[in-house]
Swiss-Prot record:
Native organism taxonomy: Eukaryota, Metazoa, Chordata, Craniata, Vertebrata
Tissue expression summary: Expressed in acinar cells of the submandibular salivary gland from where it is secreted into saliva (at protein level). Also released from the submandibular salivary gland into blood and excreted in urine (at protein level). Expressed in the lacrimal gland from where it is secreted into tears (at protein level).
Subcellular location field: Secreted; Cytoplasm
Source organism (scientific name): Mesocricetus auratus (Golden hamster)
Record's protein name: Male-specific submandibular salivary gland protein
Signal peptide interval: 1-15
Length: 172
C-alpha cells in the first residue's frame, strides 16, 4: 500500500510540473520580447534555425481560446515577419502550424515574463522547445536561473540555452 501511495504521489508531482497555466487577455495582450530559448535539438533554435523566434506581440481572444503571436525569424541575416494563431485544444495546449505542427502552452508567469513550452513535430521528428518572453528587453540573473530550472524539467541541457536579446535586430 505504501508503494502505491508513493507511486501516486510521484505521478502527481510529475504531472504538476508540466501543467498548463491559464492566462487572461490582460496578462497577454501587448508588446513582448524574446529573452531566452532552448531546445532538446539545439540546431532548431541556434542562429538561422527554423524555430529561433523573436517575439514582438502577443494577443489572446475569445477568453484566450485563440492565441496570436507576431514574431520574426532570420534567414541569412534577413528578418522575416510571421503571424500564427494557435487554437486551444481540449488538453489546454494551443495548436498551430509553423515549420511543422506546434503544440504550445504557458508553463510559468512571473515578473512581466512568460515561459512557453512548445512541442514541434515535423519531418525530422519531435522537438521540445522552451521560450521565455518579457515585457522588457533585458533579463535578470534570477530569470535566467528560473529558465535553467524549467529547461531541466523538460530534459533540455543548460548548454542548449540561447540568449536572444543580443541577436534580436528585427523591427528595431
Amino acid at each position: 500500500m505504501v508503494k502505491f501511495l508513493l507511486l501516486a504521489l510521484a505521478l502527481g508531482v510529475s504531472c504538476a510540473q508540466h501543467q498548463n497555466l491559464e492566462v487572461s487577455p490582460s496578462e497577454v495582450d501587448g508588446k513582448w520580447h524574446s529573452l531566452y530559448i532552448a531546445a532538446d535539438n539545439k540546431s532548431k533554435v541556434s542562429e538561422g534555425g527554423p524555430l529561433r523566434v523573436y517575439v514582438k506581440h502577443l494577443e489572446c481572444s475569445d477568453e484566450c481560446q485563440t492565441f496570436t503571436i507576431k514574431f520574426y525569424t532570420k534567414v541569412e541575416n534577413v528578418c522575416q515577419e510571421h503571424r500564427v494563431v494557435g487554437r486551444k485544444g481540449k488538453d489546454g495546449k494551443y495548436i498551430t502550424d509553423f515549420s511543422g505542427q506546434n503544440y504550445f502552452h504557458v508553463v510559468e508567469k512571473a515578473d512581466d515574463t512568460m515561459t512557453f513550452h512548445n512541442v514541434n513535430v515535423d519531418d525530422s521528428g519531435k522537438t521540445n522547445v522552451i521560450l521565455v518572453v518579457g515585457k522588457g528587453e533585458s533579463s535578470s540573473i534570477e530569470q535566467k536561473q528560473r529558465f535553467e530550472k524549467t529547461a531541466e524539467k523538460y530534459d533540455i541541457p543548460k548548454e542548449n540555452i540561447e540568449h536572444l536579446v543580443t541577436t534580436d535586430t528585427c523591427n528595431q
